[in-house]
């Protein structure tokens, strides 16, 4: 399948590899916090991380709480979400957090010192580029992804086939999601998780809106 579907077991496997082989949680305790507003996909990810690490990590619901949980000031912060598509949402959220009058300076200092990282299941190349530009000291962990409709290296093969699929996705995507026919911020993703489908994925995969008087039946719903 050209759709990258991550089952719960796949997610556990990816996170285990990153946590123990890349972040190396056994050698140092970190404070894990979900990215963005409460109730978003980051919360689901944070819960899974808790199930994996148990008391090997510390966990917080927001930045203010996370900073208070740094017992001796040595713990790093790991910001958690399932997916980084364009990187804009995460970057904008961080920009707001670092100007918070209560804790912004402390967070900004930690970022400058390389004490903040991001954990995701998948991070698109363009998200990594944007984060590197706006926050060069933040390491982004996650499997790499790229746009589906590239002229070189597309998952659909050569340009002729790729263009045909792109036109198909755009035609129906424009009816289902006029502002983002190929996914949020033109992400052109084919990513699906067992718990949800990112809106960066092309809408023909997840939308259940109607075209005319016929409702579109998604292959995978936006939320499981």
Please annotate each region the language model reported.
Residues 1-224:
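PRPP-associated nucleotide enzymes
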